[in-house]
């Protein structure tokens, strides 16, 4: 049994008004959706519920209008892309509460889909205001949360509603929760975590939580430089948070105490300037020239990481190993991603990855579809990895 209430627990939805929180915060240009990935991910759940004969009422935010009606943050331009993904007409209401919403909901027939205007047009959304949550709940009989990416926020449409109506996880939310549970809550061991990206400062909580939970932790990207510096190695002109040397030392000590093996780069690809195809050399990490900066992990480091992955049953990945957006400094990220993908396809590894740069890096390597699960959630994925309770998820926990 799942630890969370899902659509499988909801019974018949025929004739019910189903308020479904979705993530439609998609990139737009000149009033058109330029990347419909988020829409395509929630479309199957919307279709499933509509085909059961429910009246599907979609709630979403867009941008950061901060409680004011900003025309540039209207959800109306999303309607054509939503209709195209669903293969059906989608109605639109000019507000998410009040008469405009109530009238649009009253006009729905079984199987219809309605998108309500941006919840963040109301200050009560981000304050999780009780009266605003009541006003949203007035238009529904059942609540479905299909927006894991917003689950770390205790807002009226992500958390408040779940206490006012029978509440269930949608299919995409369910898949995300199942994947994260497999990744960290009850994983097959040994577990290896790969954490990259530029700064230690943004991932202190993450690193401290992971050393207590995983068997091996690979630290890569710019943040590895701070750890190398803490170990007394000169990193030249590399990005390095020297003021966090003490924090890095503390994390290394915590890992040793917890029996977590830390894997840092042993060699690096260094260049004197940060640009595509800049002249570069591969050097040991204790021989980085003063005028150079580390822009990627070297081949010996990649071999060590891949050997560690071979000895693991579960991989959790957040952040690239180098400046992957500039060739040839994408080599370590691409080689490691391809190796992890091959192990996953062979049934040897459960691989869970997430965070904006990570998704882009895996897609750049051409293996995004080969991982067990790739989360598009960003902040919510990070907070889960940090061991924090997510309000939108906690509200869906099965009682008993």
UniProtKB/Swiss-Prot annotation:
Signal peptide: none annotated. ATP binds at residues 203, 325, 355-358. One of its GO terms (molecular function) is ATP binding. It is found in: Cytoplasm. It catalyses: (2R)-3-phosphoglycerate + ATP = (2R)-3-phospho-glyceroyl phosphate + ADP. Keywords: ATP-binding, Cytoplasm, Glycolysis, Kinase, Nucleotide-binding, Transferase. PROSITE patterns: PGLYCERATE_KINASE. Substrate binds at residues 23-25, 38, 61-64, 120, 153. Disulfide bonds: none annotated. Belongs to the phosphoglycerate kinase family. This is Phosphoglycerate kinase. It comes from Methylobacterium radiotolerans (strain ATCC 27329 / DSM 1819 / JCM 2831 / NBRC 15690 / NCIMB 10815 / 0-1). The lineage of its organism: Bacteria, Pseudomonadati, Pseudomonadota, Alphaproteobacteria, Hyphomicrobiales.
């Amino acid at each position: 049994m799942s630890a969370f209430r899902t659509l499988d627990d909801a019974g018949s939805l025929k004739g019910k008004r189903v308020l479904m929180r979705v993530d439609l915060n998609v990139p737009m240009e000149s009033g058109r959706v330029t990347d419909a990935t988020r829409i395509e991910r929630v479309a199957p759940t919307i279709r499933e519920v509509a085909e059961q004969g429910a009246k599907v009422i979609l709630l979403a935010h867009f941008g950061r209008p901060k409680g004011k009606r900003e025309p540039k943050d209207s959800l109306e331009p999303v309607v054509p892309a939503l209709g195209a993904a669903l293969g059906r007409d989608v109605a639109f209401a000019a507000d998410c509460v009040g008469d405009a919403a109530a009238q649009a909901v009253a006009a729905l027939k079984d199987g219809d889909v309605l998108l309500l205007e941006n919840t963040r047009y109301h200050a009560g959304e981000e304050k999780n205001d009780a009266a605003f949550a009541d006003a949203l709940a007035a238009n529904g009989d059942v609540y479905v949360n299909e927006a894991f990416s917003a689950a770390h926020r205790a807002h009226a449409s992500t958390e408040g509603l779940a206490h006012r109506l029978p509440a269930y996880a949608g299919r995409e939310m369910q898949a995300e929760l199942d994947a994260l549970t497999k990744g960290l809550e009850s994983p097959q061991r040994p577990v290896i975590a790969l954490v990259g990206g530029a700064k230690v400062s943004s991932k202190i909580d993450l690193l401290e939580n992971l050393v207590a939970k995983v068997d091996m932790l690979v630290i890569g990207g710019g943040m590895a430089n701070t750890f190398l510096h803490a170990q007394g190695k000169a990193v030249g002109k590399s990005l390095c948070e020297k003021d966090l040397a003490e924090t890095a030392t503390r994390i290394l000590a915590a890992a040793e105490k917890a029996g977590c093996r830390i894997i840092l780069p042993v060699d690096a690809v260094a260049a004197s300037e940060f640009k595509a195809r800049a002249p570069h050399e591969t050097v040991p990490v204790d021989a980085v020239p003063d005028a150079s900066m580390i822009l990627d992990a070297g081949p010996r480091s990649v071999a060590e990481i891949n050997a560690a992955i071979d000895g693991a049953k579960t991989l959790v990945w957040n952040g690239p190993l180098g400046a992957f957006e500039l060739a040839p400094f994408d080599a370590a990220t691409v080689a490691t991603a391809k190796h992890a993908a091959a192990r996953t396809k062979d049934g040897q590894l459960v691989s869970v990855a997430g965070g904006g740069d990570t998704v882009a890096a895996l897609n750049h390597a051409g293996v995004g579809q080969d991982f067990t699960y790739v989360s598009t959630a960003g902040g919510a994925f990070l907070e889960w990895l940090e061991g924090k309770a997510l309000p939108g998820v906690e509200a869906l926990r099965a009682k008993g």
